[in-house]
């Protein structure tokens, strides 16, 4: 299969029920008559002839080519393909073409081989063997499962599935009460949706106040469901999951789960809409309760999704096993048995740091019902590689102790948020972990193709994608069937390399390059049609909004269900500036967002730089948001023979120490300092007499921190900030939404705050 995101695979098979026979002789006679007796007497008859010939001699589809390719190395698939072709031609299992008698005999032999193979597989796998997604567990799990009892609750499904019948009725008949899971994946896209969804044009139709956030509101593209949100337990959760969550919530001091933020956000997640939550107060800003509420919600949603997926597959496998006398291909002619993707992983959680992944995975384990986590495989290895602590309590994983029992927090001059993020030794950004849920255990470090959930950093997945592009023997096909994507702490990811994240999201739901043991006869049509990206739910969580997040959400999150995003009003942070600094804001004009960078540099070189070039005072710090801007400004200063030093993203510690000293003593008059360098290092710079914000920081808390670095006692302390109308998001977080709107629309282009 070619890794083409827009490719289409078609499943061609009979829509008749498996126990209904066709009048194949009549069908064959009509077809031969039309083809062998062409008429040229009238245009109408010529048209009929052309149409008939088109039906007989049509080009093979990508799906047919796929089956042929897979059949060349897999006899079972080859036999299935032959029978499928025979069905399309209107032939029964016993009827043979006169011209292809030998070939049909070989097909019938293949049918016997297939039945024999299936029987042998059943015996070898055993009753306890799990075969989700066409992938079987390894020998170790076989041994683990042999001693386990069958638990009826493990197979419960919210969409009630009736018993198979043999009187011509459908194998699967969903009840009138269909879960959000079933309703979402069973939807069939219209031709209009297929045409319009890739364009990424969305119109937000409604607004509704956000729960417990008086300054925020939700906006949505589809119908407003918040007022009529499901208010009765278990809120779409599997009962076992809900009961465990409720018990855990009460154990941690919670009184009313039903009206809690975490339950309400779970209901939003369970709507299967794409979600952009841009006002999550993170745990490192003393927002552990709000952060854990959102985390609980998307983790419960993820568990609910993979458990319902597993239950549906196991139910269908059980029903197929009860009807071994009926050929599997005929059973699978019922759409109710199309329950799988190309590969098993269904949930992808992207996180920026290993320490955050540790926190999320520990909570995922806690939220799993105890009967389904009797054993957590490789937990010690996980603690060693991801954590710096022996244990966490069951209340959102907030209790932190080091391996030797001492507190991991150490005295530091760094701010508390930096200590929470980077104070330990588990903050690297290169990791990937497969998590597999079996009936009574959780397997960490599972093979990615046999995992249910993948937790990874954008960097690690970007590296895997690059390796697959260079080496055709490697692949990232485990990303082909992701149905729920969670991007948590997107604000921290934006301080890394956003392009890595964009690349990963772009690679999701592409056609796989290999089969990976998948039963192609049970793949959902949405995958074969190349529409998986239109069904993928994307949940993005951040403490603030950036243009890059807006772009990703609008262009790469194409869920047919629609979108919800948060819009907030800000008060600003100017009051947190403790020094008497005269803060000047200068607006420059840019025709479009693609011209902003050039317009900013031009304004700086013509309006700002001449004022500081010949200054004898020195102590000028230029704060820059992005590394791209940093490089352009550095190159410009080099052409001006300016005395300056650098504190950039990739500066070595020795160079940083030298630059700080040179700036403080005045041997270098100008310092360039990037927001990313400040985010990771938090160096307090001494000797600042004049502050220029070449571009506004994304993180609003950085603004007063940088302002308060100005040398107290300096004569006429002043700062200058450049902005354009395209900087509205950053500007409103700093000066407040009301002031920002006035500054963007005013005829004046200079504003002062004292």
From Swiss-Prot:
Residues 1-56, 69-166, 390-413 are annotated as: Disordered. Preferentially expressed in differentiating cells in young tissues such as floral buds, ovules, embryos, secondary roots, pollen, young seedlings and vascular bundles. Observed ubiquitously. InterPro entries: P-loop_NTPase, UTP25, UTP25_C, UTP25_NTPase-like. It comes from the Eukaryota. It holds the Pfam family Utp25_C. Disruption phenotype: Abnormal female gametogenesis and altered embryo development with a disturbed cellular division pattern. Increased rRNA expression and hypomethylation of rRNA promoters. GO terms for molecular function: U3 snoRNA binding. Residues 80-93 have a biased composition (Basic and acidic residues). Residues 42-52, 94-110, 138-161 have a biased composition (Acidic residues). It is found in: Nucleus, Nucleolus. The keyword Ubl conjugation does not apply. Its main location: nucleus. One of its GO terms (cellular component) is ribonucleoprotein complex. GO terms for biological process: embryo development ending in seed dormancy; embryo sac development; rRNA processing; rRNA transcription. Residues 402-413 have a biased composition (Polar residues). Keywords: Nucleus, Ribonucleoprotein, Ribosome biogenesis, rRNA processing. Coiled coil: none annotated. Belongs to the UTP25 family. DEAD-box RNA helicase-like protein required for pre-18S rRNA processing, specifically at sites A0, A1, and A2. Involved in the control of rRNA expression. Required for embryo development and female gametogenesis. Component of the ribosomal small subunit (SSU) processome composed of at least 40 protein subunits and snoRNA U3. Interacts with THAL in the nucleus. This is Protein NUCLEOLAR FACTOR 1. The lineage of its organism: Eukaryota, Viridiplantae, Streptophyta, Embryophyta, Tracheophyta.
């Amino acid at each position: 299969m070619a890794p083409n995101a827009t490719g289409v695979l078609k499943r061609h098979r009979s829509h008749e029920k498996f126990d209904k026979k066709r009048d194949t002789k009549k069908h064959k006679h009509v077809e031969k008559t039309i083809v062998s007796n062409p008429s040229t007497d009238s245009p109408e008859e010529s048209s009929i002839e052309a149409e008939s010939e088109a039906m007989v001699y049509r080009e093979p589809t990508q799906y047919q080519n796929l089956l042929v390719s897979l059949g060349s190395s897999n006899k079972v698939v080859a036999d299935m393909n032959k029978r499928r072709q025979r069905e399309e031609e209107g032939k029964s299992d016993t009827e043979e073409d006169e011209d292809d008698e030998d070939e049909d005999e070989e097909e019938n032999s293949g049918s016997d081989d297939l039945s024999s193979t299936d029987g042998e597989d059943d015996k070898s796998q055993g009753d306890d063997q799990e075969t989700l997604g066409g992938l079987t567990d390894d020998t170790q799990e076989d041994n683990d499962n042999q001693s386990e009892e069958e638990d009826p609750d493990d197979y419960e499904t919210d969409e009630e599935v009736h018993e198979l019948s043999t009187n011509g009725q459908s194998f699967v008949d969903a009840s009138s009460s269909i879960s959000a899971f079933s309703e979402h994946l069973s939807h069939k896209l219209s031709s209009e949706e297929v045409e319009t969804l890739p364009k990424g044009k969305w119109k937000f139709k409604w607004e509704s106040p956000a729960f417990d956030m008086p300054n925020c509101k939700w906006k949505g593209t589809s119908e407003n469901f918040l007022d009529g949100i499901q208010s009765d337990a278990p809120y779409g959760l599997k009962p076992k999951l809900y009961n465990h969550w409720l018990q855990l919530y009460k154990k941690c001091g919670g009184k009313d789960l039903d009206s809690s933020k975490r339950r309400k956000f779970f209901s939003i997640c369970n709507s299967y809409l794409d979600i952009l939550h841009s006002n999550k107060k993170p745990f490192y800003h003393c927002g552990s309760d709000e952060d854990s509420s959102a985390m609980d919600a998307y983790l419960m949603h993820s568990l609910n999704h993979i458990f319902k997926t597993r239950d549906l597959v196991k139910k269908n496998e059980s029903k197929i096993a009860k009807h071994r006398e009926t050929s599997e291909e005929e059973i699978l002619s019922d759409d109710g048995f199309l329950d799988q993707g190309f590969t098993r992983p269904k949930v992808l959680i992207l996180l920026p740091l290993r320490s955050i992944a540790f926190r999320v995975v520990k909570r995922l384990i806690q939220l799993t019902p105890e009967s389904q986590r009797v054993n957590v495989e490789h937990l010690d290895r996980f603690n060693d590689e991801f954590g710096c602590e022996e244990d966490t309590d069951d209340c959102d994983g907030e209790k932190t102790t080091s391996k030797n029992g001492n507190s991991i927090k150490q005295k530091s001059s760094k701010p508390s948020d930096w200590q929470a993020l980077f104070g330990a030794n588990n903050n690297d950004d290169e990791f990937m972990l497969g998590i597999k849920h079996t009936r009574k255990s959780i397997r960490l470090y599972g093979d990615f193709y046999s995992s249910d959930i993948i937790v990874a950093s954008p960097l690690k997945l970007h590296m895997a994608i690059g390796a697959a592009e260079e080496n055709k023997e490697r692949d990232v096909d485990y990303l082909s069937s992701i149905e729920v994507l969670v991007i948590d702490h997107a604000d921290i990811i934006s301080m890394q390399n956003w392009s890595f994240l964009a690349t990963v999201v772009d690679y999701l739901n592409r056609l796989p390059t290999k089969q990976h043991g998948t039963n192609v006869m049970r793949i959902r049509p949405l995958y074969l049609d190349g529409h998986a990206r239109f069904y993928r739910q994307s949940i993005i969580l951040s403490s603030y909004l950036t243009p890059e997040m807006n772009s990703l959400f609008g262009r790469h999150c194409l869920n047919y269900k629609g979108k919800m995003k948060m819009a907030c009003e800000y008060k600003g942070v100017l009051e947190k500036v403790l020094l008497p600094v005269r803060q000047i804001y200068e607006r420059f004009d840019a025709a479009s967002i693609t011209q902003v960078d050039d317009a900013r540099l031009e304004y700086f070189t013509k309006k700002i730089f001449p004022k500081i070039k010949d200054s004898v005072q020195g102590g000028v710090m230029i704060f820059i948001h992005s590394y791209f801007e940093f490089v352009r400004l550095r190159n410009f200063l080099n052409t001006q023979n300016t005395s300056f030093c650098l504190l950039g993203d990739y500066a070595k510690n020795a160079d940083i120490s030298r630059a700080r000293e040179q700036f403080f003593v005045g041997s270098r008059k100008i310092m360039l300092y990037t927001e990313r360098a400040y985010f990771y290092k938090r160096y307090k710079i001494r000797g600042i007499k004049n502050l220029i914000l070449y571009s506004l920081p994304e993180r609003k808390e950085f603004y007063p921190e940088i302002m308060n670095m100005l040398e107290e006692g300096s004569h006429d302390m002043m700062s200058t900030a450049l902005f354009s109308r395209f900087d509205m998001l950053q500007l409103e977080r700093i000066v407040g939404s009301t002031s920002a709107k006035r500054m963007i629309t005013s005829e004046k282009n200079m504003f002062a705050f004292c």
